[in-house]
Amino acid sequence: MKKLTLKAPAKVNYRLDVLRRRPDGYHDLRMIMQRIDLCDEIEICLTDGPGIRVVCGREGVPDGPGNIAWRAADALLALSADKPGIDISITKKIPVAAGLGGGSSDAATVLMGVNELLGLDLPEKRLREIGVTLGADVPFFIFGRTALAEGIGEELTAIDRVPAAWIVVVNPNVPVSTAWVYQNLQLTGEAARVKIPRFFESVAEVCAILSNDLESVTIPRYPVIGEIKRELLAAGALGSLMSGSGPTVFALFEEEDAAVRAAEMMRARSWFAAAVRTI
């Protein structure tokens, strides 16, 4: 049967502004989202079936319908006249529940892969519409470009000129509840007045707009996040920020050597750390 092996990249948020709470309980956001070359590997295979099987083997990641990748495959299988079995194997490299979008990226990759394997030929716009029913970040990974994301994250505008950078990501392995972060966030309205550029000429220009409203909640509760930011800046980073609701921190470097040294320094603290490129 047909098979695909695909990479599902992580993301960082160069900016995350929380604008307002919506009547449906979600929040309107304004984000700059950037993919990075820290990737899960996903193998998708059509079988004689029936049914969908997901195997991951990572603690905390379900293998059945509780896995967002399973639900992605199920959503496309429902649109297919043929009903083959679908086997999905996920090799996790992206830390789980870390603010890096790993689950959403896995789901987006499965949507694109199953769309190809089943010959559905659904356009990107339709895949993004399906994706947002699975998770707010899923459309971004289908979009596949650095983007300004608005609404709950599904309204995407390409940012066409963004310099490549070395990114060091550090996860201190502390559990952070996204729901708790948003429940405790005090909205100020200040972010809405900040103008966001549509292009950047240098890494320094990117660093000038780094901001994450959720840090005001997460860092007081988990001071290690602020500590990591300070250490990365001391190691030569041009800028550093918490990604998403945390706990992962990332930092931008212009030179590979400095990024690799900083990642090694962080791993010496028994934290997950990687030096990767933007994509």
Curated annotation (Swiss-Prot):
- State the InterPro entries in the record: GHMP_kinase_C_dom, GHMP_kinase_C_sf, GHMP_kinase_N_dom, IspE, Ribosomal_Su5_D2-typ_SF, Ribsml_uS5_D2-typ_fold_subgr
Reaction(s) catalysed (UniProt annotation): 4-CDP-2-C-methyl-D-erythritol + ATP = 4-CDP-2-C-methyl-D-erythritol 2-phosphate + ADP + H(+)
Q: Name one Pfam family in it.
A: GHMP_kinases_C
- Could you give a GO molecular-function term held by this entry? ATP binding
Residues at the active site: K11, D137
The EC number(s) this enzyme carries: 2.7.1.148
Q: Which SUPFAM superfamilies match?
A: GHMP Kinase, C-terminal domain, Ribosomal protein S5 domain 2-like
GO BP terms: namely: isopentenyl diphosphate biosynthetic process, methylerythritol 4-phosphate pathway; terpenoid biosynthetic process
Arranged from A to Z, the UniProt key words for this protein are: ATP-binding, Isoprene biosynthesis, Kinase, Nucleotide-binding, Transferase
Binding sites annotated in the UniProt record for ATP: P95, V96, A97, A98, G99, L100, G101, G102, G103, S104, S105
Q: In which pathway does it act?
A: Isoprenoid biosynthesis; isopentenyl diphosphate biosynthesis via DXP pathway; isopentenyl diphosphate from 1-deoxy-D-xylulose 5-phosphate: step 3/6
Role description:
Catalyzes the phosphorylation of the position 2 hydroxy group of 4-diphosphocytidyl-2C-methyl-D-erythritol.
Which protein family is named in the record?
Belongs to the GHMP kinase family. IspE subfamily.
Q: Which NCBIfam families match?
A: ispE (TIGR00154), PRK14608.1 (NF011202)
Q: What is this protein called?
A: 4-diphosphocytidyl-2-C-methyl-D-erythritol kinase
Q: Which organism is it from?
A: Geobacter sulfurreducens (strain ATCC 51573 / DSM 12127 / PCA)
